Amino acid sequence: RSFMEALHKATQSLEIKRNGIGADGKGYTDYETVINKLTNPSWDRVFVIYDAIKMGISLNRIHEITKIDIWYLRQYESLIALENQISKFKIDDISKELLLEAKQMGFADRQIAHMLGCLESVVHKKRKSLNINRVYKLVDTCAAEFKAKTPYYYSTFEESMQLSDGTIITENESEVTDRKKIIVLGSGPNRIGQGIEFDYCCVHGVLAASECGYETIMINCNPETVSTDFDTADKLYFEPVFWEHIYDIIQHEKPEGVIVQLGGQTALKLAEKLDRYGIKIIGTTYKSLDLAEDRGSFSTLLKENKIPYPEFGVAKTADEALVLADKLDFPILVRPSYVLGGQGMKIVINKKELEAHVVDLLQKIPNNKLLLDHYLDGAIEAEADAICDGKNVLIIGIMEHIEPCGVHSGDSNATLPPFNLGKLVMQQIIDHTNKIALSLNTVGLINIQFAIKDEVVYIIEANPRASRTVPFIAKAYKQPYVNYATKVMLGKLKVSDIDYKPKLEGFAIKQPVFSFNKFPNVNKSLGPEMKSTGESILFIDDLKDDQFYELYSRRKMYLSK
């Protein structure tokens, strides 16, 4: 339990493709860049300090520039000394004492693997064989004022103790019961693009699993959420939503399965590893989750079901993207795979812009498949949310966006129900939603986004998980849809058993909330990358409402690229 272990955990929670502080080959190596970043505070300063010390810049010089207390800089120095020491060994030669020290200082298995030149899984097996395991401690919610026992845990590494009878133990305060357990993966750090809507889904999913008789276990790392209230789940692990931490908790608790579809893209990205390690995913399987994300496979599914979609292509390099551009025609929407909130998405209108954006994306997210879609200029955007049990589909809400197609769905004002879609279009949306949900073998929630042009409904994408619009629909219709969906995932409820009685007179409008006053230098124009930090709900009796007229005027707005 040290400052550096805490700092490592904090940086592992950020989801920025870093494994902690240092030891991942992603640091700065240019002296001028490091000095400039130390002089001008930025979000990554916590990493730059490590790079500066490793480069040989003195602690006094760093203190002089940053005014950070020498004590903290010495903590960094001890980390670098440990990294240098470990890097001299191979996995077979490293001692238990040195490996334990690395874990106590917060280094992830992936970082240690980088130092030793081996795989993360090999480091994990090595420490397990040496009995170097996480122990879980109760968070003192009363700051030692009086004794309080709450099921609110964090992990750390301790030296084992030997009892008089020779038994070796470590003190673990998380006691495992013999009840059937379900783990719900949280949404991780709240940031622009992934906010409190997914936390709503996690909380209601936990409550539904509890109603079904399961011991509920929540894993999340953000203290500003309801899911991290210690009385929401039976057990709360306040840990990074990071593979190593999750796998250790799963091995400790041995749950019936893990729910990944309520925590947004953060949780969904871990589905592949859960599947590879034979851990049961509750609800929609990894195969179906991956099929929806794999543009090639998903387009084949759409073709088989005779569902139209915009022309698209997949590129791994800038050269491939430029070749694709000749086939797709501009404007083109460029986006990486497995991202939320439109991170890295951009509309490009010529080859120069396309090449520059693709090169930039591949530097930030190496080895990522880039999806290139022909952008349907002037189309109307709509989306549908549904619950499916693998046999039947219940569409819980269809929303029409007021802003033009191309504005991220999180930034759009949207009406529930739609205000301007004809019967032909609505029937296409219903038919497409039913076909896709069943073809993907969805068990739980699914969100599908559509572009409508000349009375034809095109599929933009399908996400077999909770979307940020589900809480809005549940609030507007006064129905516990996440509760229903979770019980469907657990096999305790069928879609045909759901009593669907939405209660809404008039229209509900989802309105994004922006924080541009906090970010004065940010481009305020809307586009495919999400910029809103929240949302509100507006109820109107009819379309003659003045507030609706004001919103509707935005339909002709220009998009930012």
Per-segment meaning from a language model:
Residues 192-195, 289, 469-473:
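A generic structural signal for short coil/turn motifs at secondary-structure boundaries
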Residues 53, 210, 275, 303, ...:
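Anion (oxyanion) recognition and catalysis
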Residues 111-157, 161-163, 167-171:
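C-terminal amphipathic alpha-helical interaction region
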Residues 284-345:
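A conserved helix-loop-beta module that forms one wall/lid of the active-site cleft
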